[in-house]
Amino acid sequence: MKLLQYIFICTLILTANAIQAQSVYLTPGGKEEWLLNRLEIKTRTKQLSFSNFKPLNRKWVVNEVDKLDSLYATKDSTTKGLTELDKYNIQRLLMANSEWSKPKEIYIAEKSLIKGLYVNRANMIDKRNSDFILIANPIFNFQQGSKAGNTQSTFINQRGINVRGIIGNKIGFYFYFTENQERQPTYVQDWRNKFIAVPGAGYIKNFKVGGFDYFDVRGGVSWQVAKFMDMQLAYDRNFIGNGYRSLFLSDFSANNMFIKVNTYFGKFKYQNIFSELVSYRRSGSDRIYPRKYFRASYLSYQPTRWLNIGLFEGVMLGKRDKLSLPLFNPIMYTSF
């Protein structure tokens, strides 16, 4: 872990003069991703075809969706498959990310019940000046379900806060925190009992009968090194691939600490992720959790709107191995 910290500090110092305005990323699994997946399928544009890298950069998303919104207004053939509900969801996305979208009067509330809150209709707190932007929203998610023949109901009880911002027009930051109580369907409970883990969660504890309780904490900083490259240091999850689950890198695991480098050149995108993985299985005594170190590299090429070609490499160092410098070689297939 110390090596990751040293590399981050050295990189930040070396690139300090070149840092440009940088956005943070969309919340993994959020409703914005659902909308983008739909827009990619309905419009089939190359601009939205890099969604096999998640989470997505907010600034990039707003730029592309704003272009699509303009095409919809002119009834361009690209948007003929979109509905009025799609139009509404596009406006909601642009409103929620107004730090990057074009100013519109409909984004500003006529009046708010509490002074200073929901000045922007989509964000509870939206404070900004020439050097600082702060946006914060509460998180409330309550769901309950049932299944025929099962006396136990399923439920999700989630409360928390989501904060993001930009410092000095150069460093983007975000923080996401929720407290969660859940009782999942029987097959998920069986999986949990078998592997002593919950999909997407780290440390967990029992809650009532068949339920579990856990915190979901994420956060990080990001900065743009050059026009064609950005970097991120965060404690979160990543996704490389297509579909709900990926055979390359899925967000099925718990959050982990990582450094990520994205490089863009024409129709190519190259991503490197260097991360530390921690096993949260409890052994009944106080001890250091086992750790592994992992690097994922993915090169994506989008020659047409219907074809994407990718190369993937994953390197894992087991818990008995010491952290090795070749792991940080960003060139695919040359580390070991």
Where do the model's predicted regions map?
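Outer-membrane beta-barrel domain signature
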Residues: L26, S51, K147-T151, N206-V209, ...
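Residues on the lipid-exposed face of transmembrane beta-strands in outer-membrane beta-barrel proteins
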Residues: I161-G165, G219-W223, L233, I259-T263, ...
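Transmembrane beta-barrel architecture of outer-membrane proteins
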Residues: V119-N120, N137-I139, I156-G160, Y214-R218, ...
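Bacterial Sec-dependent N-terminal signal peptides
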Residues: M1-V24
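Outer-membrane beta-barrel strand-turn architecture
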Residues: R128, I167-N169, Q224-K227, Y264-K267, ...
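Transmembrane beta-strand segments of Gram-negative outer membrane beta-barrel proteins
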Residues: P28-I41, L94-S153, G165, N169-F175, ...
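Carboxylate/His-rich catalytic cores and anion/metal-binding grooves
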Residues: I161-Y203, K208, T304-E313
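Signature for the C-terminal beta-barrel architecture of outer-membrane proteins
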Residues: F212, N238-F239, S246, S250-F336
